Structure formats: structure tokens, C-alpha cells
Curated annotation (Swiss-Prot):
SUPFAM superfamilies: An anticodon-binding domain of class I aminoacyl-tRNA synthetases (SSF48163), Nucleotidylyl transferase (SSF52374). A motif ('KMSKS' region) lies at residues 243-247. It comes from Polaromonas sp. (strain JS666 / ATCC BAA-500). It comes from the Bacteria. The lineage of its organism: Bacteria, Pseudomonadati, Pseudomonadota, Betaproteobacteria, Burkholderiales. Monomer. ATP binds at residue 246. A motif ('HIGH' region) lies at residues 11-21. This is Glutamate--tRNA ligase.
């Protein structure tokens, strides 16, 4: 029977989650969904001083907004300490770990000596028990760390789904600290126990973890467990070519929601930020999941481009049904205290969406249907001329009695043009400036139909 795919996203809740982080959630989520597998959310919160529940909430909120639903979790490492300590005890009984009493000062002195000799700084195995070896006397009052007995000789080899075959000599790896003096386990050990207990089959994560992988593989093997498949994703760079980070100006994922980006557009953009399906640039979530596999993950660092993100978002806005857009934009209007009935909101979405890159821009247009805009002095002087003013009064009078429909409004405009001899652009530009605050709008009769009759008439009577 084919083994069920199980992937995970395991962030540390030490700050907000940005686009580089969330891409490391998108791909394992997509792989699980594309293969009928399970996606697990795990919170690696062992850094107690820096971790916070607020950061966890932001992570979950960002994933929920993007629709990256998890099948199991969230699991918290701090709630699994008893399990880690039980496995540590088993390994200690099997002679796979040992206590090390070397002090921080002794380790620092060792590193300085190695660096002076142009050697790689590493633990030298002073306290590693070996047949026939005499260990130093145990110092009084010192709580030891526990170190993992890394294999000596040979190498660790794995076929990375992004980077290809990777081989690391065990001679390059020292004996890893897997428990601190107070008994709390360290990151690399906890990760392995979690991946075993949660039956993770594929670890898809950033390539800043590549150096951890051989150490983790050796712990898997010491515990007699199968090693998962690894895929280490290249770094996401910001627009300046630096690694994306809070320090370098990255924004929280949730800020993009507030700026009016669509979740499916963000998934589309992030998917392309390290994966490809031929030349396809715009695709739905369903298409992405149909196409996604690990074979087309990029090997080079991807660079974030906000202008490209806005373009992708604009394409998704245009493709979204008007009634769905109305649902999405309504909270943006409500936050401004702007009330617009559903029918007019749906109609406005159809009129304006081709002019917008975000929901915020769409809300800007829809708001004008209610509040009008403040025209510039330049637009007034250019378009609302003495030659046009009489026609504006005639149009206001005609609109008082006519049916409030696009066809009737168009007929009223046509009648005023016939009576005054004006050309359509002369009258239309003036009306747009007065009722919407800008000479650049969609079809005038369609715009006026979506506005309240009394608002239009009052703005035309100057």
C-alpha cells in the first residue's frame, strides 16, 4: 500500500510571519492537498523568552486568510516536553547520548585555539566515552549537557528534491548538544521526535536548515526510524536583493490582507516565487493544486516584486465574479462608514474592477458613488466651462422626472445634447467632474444609474 503523504509547517512564534515564511507553508500544504495527504501545523516554541501567543495568533491568522488549512494541530513543542525527555532517557540507556561537563569558558577557549590553527571550530569529544578511554574527573556542582554520539566515519547522504544529492562527511559533524543543563531538549532533537511521532513523510522547508539535516538524519537512524524526504527551498529575497526579513523591511502577511490583496492572488504569486508550470503566470488555486509537485521547484533564490504582485492581484480582481467581489470589498467600505446597498455594490464592482489593482482601490471608486469626490480647481476650470453650465442645469431638470435606469439616463443626456448643440465629451466630462470628482470614469449613464438621483441632481446644480 502506498504510504500517505504527511507534511508539516513548523514556525517559531518569535515575530510576525512574512511572505518568505508563508511560502514555506504554502508548498507543504499544496503537496499534501495535491496528493490527498495531511498537512500538520506545529509551533516550535522552545525559545521561551522570544516566543509569544500573539505571534502564534498572527501565524494562524495569516494561514487562515490564505486558506492554508491544516488537518492536525497546532501542536506545541513546549507541551511535549515529557515525550522528549522519555526518548532522551531511552537513548541514554542505549548509550547513544552522554553527559558533557565542559564549561562555556572551556568551549570558548577550544574554539579560539582551533580558529588560531585555522581549523573548523567544533567540539572535540573530550567527554565522549570510548572503550579504553579515561574521562576527566567530573567537576563538582556542574550540571552537564547531553550530547548525541554522532557516528564516526562514513557520511550522511540524501537526495534533496530541490538541491539534488547531498553528502556530508560525519567527520564534519561534532557531537550535537541535544539537552541543556536544565534537561530541556534542543531544537534538532525535538524536530526529529516530532517528525517521527507525527509520521512526517516529506520535510519541505527553507534552505537555511540544510546544515541541520545531516544531524537530524543521524538521530533518525539512531532511533531506528525511516528518514523523511527532504526538499530545501531557496531563499526569498526582497526587492533590494537581501534575504527577506523583518529587519529588512518585510511586511506581515496580514498587512497584505489589509491592503486589499486577494488570498487566491497571493497564493498564485507565492506559488510562482519558487515553482513553475511552464509559462503559466495566472492560475486559480484549483489549477495550482492540480499541477503542483516537487519536481518543478526552483533551485535559485526568488526575488519579491511588489509591482508584479499588484499585477497578479489585478488579474484575479478582473476574473472574480461581481457578487463575490462585492462580498470581499464590503468590509473595506464598512470600515469607512460608507453604506452601499448590495445591488449598487455589485454593479459598481462590475464597472470599476478593471481599473483596480486592490480591494482598497475598488473601495475608493465605490465610495465615490455615495460621497462623490472633490474635484480639483484645474478640472473645474477645464471642463465646467461657461459654455457647458446651461446644459448641466437642463440635464439636472431632465433627470428629476425620468425613469432611473441606464437607458432613460442615456436618453436624457442625448436630449440635452440635441437641445444645446454640445458634443458628448463636453457634457460628459463636466458631469463626471461634478458628480465623481474626476473626468476619468466608466460609461457615464452606467455611473449615474448606480448613484442616488438626489445626489446627482444636487451636484449638477452649481
Amino acid at each position: 500500500m502506498t504510504q500517505k503523504i504527511r507534511t508539516r509547517f513548523a514556525p517559531s512564534p518569535t515575530g510576525f510571519i512574512h511572505l518568505g515564511n508563508i511560502r514555506s507553508a504554502l508548498y507543504p500544504w499544496a503537496f499534501a492537498r495535491a496528493t490527498g495527504g495531511d498537512f500538520i501545523l506545529r509551533i516550535e516554541d522552545t525559545d521561551v523568552e522570544r516566543s509569544s501567543q500573539a505571534a502564534v495568533d498572527v501565524i494562524i491568522e495569516g494561514m487562515r486568510w490564505l486558506g492554508l488549512d491544516h488537518d492536525e494541530g497546532p501542536f506545541y513543542q513546549m507541551q511535549r516536553m515529557d515525550r522528549y525527555k522519555a526518548v532522551l532517557a531511552e537513548m541514554q540507556a542505549a548509550g547513544q547520548v552522554y553527559p558533557c561537563y565542559m564549561s562555556v569558558a572551556e568551549l570558548d577557549a577550544l574554539r579560539e585555539k582551533q580558529m588560531a590553527a585555522k581549523e573548523k571550530p567544533r567540539y572535540d569529544g573530550t567527554w565522549r566515552p570510548e572503550p579504553g578511554k579515561t574521562l576527566p574527573p567530573i567537576p563538582a556542582g556542574v550540571q552537564p549537557v547531553l550530547r548525541f554520539k554522532n557516528p564516526q566515519g562514513g557520511s550522511v547522504v540524501w537526495d534533496d528534491k530541490v538541491k539534488g544529492r547531498i553528502e556530508i562527511s560525519n567527520d564534519e559533524l561534532d557531537d550535537l548538544v541535544i539537552a541543556r543543563p536544565d534537561g530541556t531538549p534542543t531544537y534538532n532533537f525535538c524536530v526529529v521526535v516530532d517528525d517521527i511521532d507525527m509520521a512526517i513523510t516529506h520535510v519541505i522547508r527553507g534552505d537555511d536548515h540544510v546544515n541541520n539535516t545531516p544531524r537530524q538524519i543521524n538521530i533518525f537512524r539512531a532511533l531506528g526510524k525511516d528518514v523523511p524526504v527532504y526538499a530545501h527551498l531557496p531563499t526569498v529575497l526582497n526587492e533590494q536583493g537581501e534575504k527577506m526579513s523583518k529587519r529588512n523591511g518585510a511586511k506581515p502577511v496580514t498587512q497584505y490582507a489589509a491592503e486589499g490583496y486577494l488570498p487566491d492572488a497571493m497564493v498564485n504569486y507565492l506559488a510562482r516565487l519558487g515553482w513553475s508550470h511552464g509559462d503559466d503566470e495566472i492560475f486559480s488555486r484549483e489549477q495550482f493544486l492540480k499541477w503542483f509537485n516537487l519536481d518543478h521547484l526552483g533551485k535559485s533564490a526568488a526575488q519579491f516584486d511588489e509591482a508584479k504582485l499588484r499585477w497578479v492581484n489585478a488579474q484575479h480582481l478582473k476574473a472574480t465574479a461581481d457578487d463575490k467581489l462585492a462580498e470581499l470589498v464590503q468590509p473595506f467600505l464598512a470600515a469607512r462608514g460608507v453604506g452601499l446597498d448590495t445591488a449598487r455594490m455589485v454593479g459598481g464592482c462590475g464597472l470599476f474592477k478593471d481599473r483596480c489593482s486592490t480591494l482598497v482601490e475598488l473601495a475608493d471608486w465605490l465610495q465615490l458613488l455615495v460621497t462623490g469626490g472633490q474635484p480639483s480647481a484645474q478640472d473645474i476650470s477645464t471642463h465646467v466651462t461657461e459654455a457647458v453650465r446651461p446644459a448641466l442645469g437642463k440635464l439636472a431638470d431632465a433627470l428629476v422626472a425620468c425613469e432611473w435606469s441606464k437607458a432613460a439616463i442615456a436618453a436624457a443626456i442625448k436630449q440635452v445634447l440635441a437641445e444645446t448643440g454640445l458634443k458628448m465629451p463636453q457634457l460628459a466630462m463636466a458631469v463626471r467632474v461634478l458628480v465623481m470628482g474626476t473626468p476619468q470614469t466608466p460609461s457615464l449613464d452606467a455611473i449615474l444609474e448606480l448613484m442616488k438621483r438626489e445626489d446627482v441632481i444636487s451636484r449638477l446644480k452649481i
